[in-house]
Amino acid sequence: MRMEDIAKIAQVSKSAVSLAFSGKPGIGNETRERILRIAREMGYNAKPRVTATVQEKSSKQLVFLVITNLGIISEEYYQQPFFRELIHFVEERCRSKGYSVVFSSVDMEHFDQSIRAVADDHRNSGVILLGTNLSREQIAFVADKLPQLVVLDTCYDTLPIHFVEINNAMGAYQAGAHLCDIGHKDIGYVASNVRIHNFEERKAGFAAALREKGLEVAPSRTFSVAPTLLSSQDSMRQQLEGCLHAEGKLPTALFCECDYIAISAMKTLTELGYRVPEDISVIGFDNINESVIVTPELTTIHVEKEKMARLAVDLLTDPAEHGSNARSKTRVDTRFVARLSTCAPTAAVGVGSSVSKPG
């Protein structure tokens, strides 16, 4: 079975099949899903690479490698604002250095086999691995096959590999300190129901900020939702209603582990009749472009995505400047961004409030 055969069965071009296997933009989701389904049914294992012939022949190229269908990284990862922006800055930095970028996506279902295939094709190329959703063992396996590796958006201190990550603890600490400084004491925490390294560090950083003020997030004020939906979520609605029923009131502020969760939470609160921030303040993390489109504009933590991308590319394109054998762990500091979704607390929102209640 060849790519040409799959293209014929799916009634699409060979280039469309290549885009479907790679995770690159350029075809619709329905077409992509049909191609991938046909490939699975026919037992075809694609070499996980996307490139034009000119790029493959270039001696100045980097590989951007993503493991999909694992944790928060789906086949459509490039449609998620945070990753879309990060990839844009990687491409931009590569162009400025005279390098091309080969995008390669590997389905977790065929992880071992596909990583070996990538290594066969790109053993001498520098590789930026999106590590957001990966375990220590998975990253170690990739590094063993692809020695010129930089891992972006996670960090494992005991691995002798270049890592560039967000200072997650710092960002969440900034969020917690802000809520405490403007007077909030009854604070809730909205976590992702898919756990990754970044979220665990944010949880610790936020708890540290509250602990300094003698506060903590009560278990009844901790919620868990899907991290990749911008719409309101029934599960969030049910958890808020359960909290209100059990406690008689909701927290006066919510910290959300990412902007996606924060925007979803704001929409859910609005549907329930609560005002943001007058009744409940909401703060996110990432400062994606959508954070200034929502109403009210989202208070959040800015992640220096451009700087992270620049550092990752430079570690591969300028190895002499960083020491050819030395490995580094770089945490890029965050910046607090005050907008309109947080304010000082007013009366507790619950039974007896002027705001209409769910139920």
Where are these regions (language model features)?
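Hinge/beta->alpha junction and helix N-cap segments in small-molecule ligand-binding domains
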Residues: G71-F82, F103-H110, V164-Q174, V190-Q238, ...
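Short acidic/polar active-site loop segments enriched in Thr and Asp
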Residues: S13, N45, K60, S125, ...
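Short hydrophobic segments within beta-strands
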Residues: L65-I67, L130, L152, Y189-V190, ...
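Flexible loop/turn connectors
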Residues: Q233, R237-G359
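N-terminal helix-turn-helix DNA-binding module of bacterial transcription factors
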Residues: M1-S58, S354-G359
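Short acidic capping loops at alpha-helix termini that bridge into adjacent secondary structure
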Residues: K185-D186, V217-R221, V276-V282
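Alpha-helical recognition/docking segments in bacterial nutrient-uptake
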Residues: S59-A177, D181, L244-K249, G359
